[in-house]
């Protein structure tokens, strides 16, 4: 089977080959880290991901887990792809809604 190169979730399309993201068919520019974070969320739709999981996957273990870098990037992503798509699960982390 052909390798999946485009991830889709509720109006979002993320092309792993071209590193392009579309929201409802409109192209959106993301930084490399934003792209990685969105890719992680889109690979686990509906699943709650902890900040620690996000930190280790997107930034590597050399970042301080007490850092708010995940929250800052989630805010930036929400502005670009729509706040309603990324849900905060209090005390847990974040999840992507479909």
Residue ranges and their predicted role:
Residues 1-8:
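Basic, amphipathic DNA-recognition helix from helix-turn-helix-like DNA-binding domains
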Residues 8-10, 17, 24:
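Short strand-coil-strand connectors
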Residues 11-13, 85:
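Short, surface-exposed charged micro-motifs
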Residues 20-32, 36-73, 79-85, 90-92:
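Positively charged, aromatic-enriched patches within helix-turn-helix-type DNA-binding elements
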Residues 95-98:
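Short, cationic-aromatic polyanion-contact patches
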């Amino acid at each position: 089977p052909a390798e999946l190169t485009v991830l889709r979730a509720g109006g979002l399309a993320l092309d792993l080959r071209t590193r392009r993201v579309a929201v409802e068919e409109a192209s959106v520019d993301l930084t490399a880290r934003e792209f990685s974070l969105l890719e992680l969320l889109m690979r686990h739709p509906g699943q709650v991901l902890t900040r620690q999981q996000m930190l280790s996957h997107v930034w590597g273990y050399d970042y301080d887990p007490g850092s708010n870098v995940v929250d800052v990037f989630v805010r930036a992503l929400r502005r670009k792809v729509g706040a309603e798509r990324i849900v905060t699960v209090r005390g847990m982390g974040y999840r992507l809604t479909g």
